[in-house]
């Protein structure tokens, strides 16, 4: 999982 500032909300399962 990549804790990107934009994707964290989407990818943080």
UniProtKB/Swiss-Prot annotation:
Glycosylated. Induction: Increased by salt stress in roots and decreased by salt stress in coleoptile. The keyword Electron transport does not apply. Keywords: Apoplast, Cell wall, Cell wall biogenesis/degradation, Cytoplasm, Endoplasmic reticulum, Glycoprotein, Microsome, Secreted. GO terms for cellular component: apoplast; cytosol; endoplasmic reticulum. Its main location: cytoplasm. One of its GO terms (biological process) is cell wall organization. The keyword Cell wall biogenesis/degradation applies. It comes from the Eukaryota. Roots and coleoptile. In roots, present in the mature region, but not in the tip. Not detected in leaves. It is found in: Cytoplasm, Cytosol; Endoplasmic reticulum; Microsome; Secreted, Extracellular space, Apoplast. Belongs to the germin family. Oligomer (believed to be a pentamer but probably hexamer). May play a role in altering the properties of cell walls during germinative growth. This is Germin GS2.
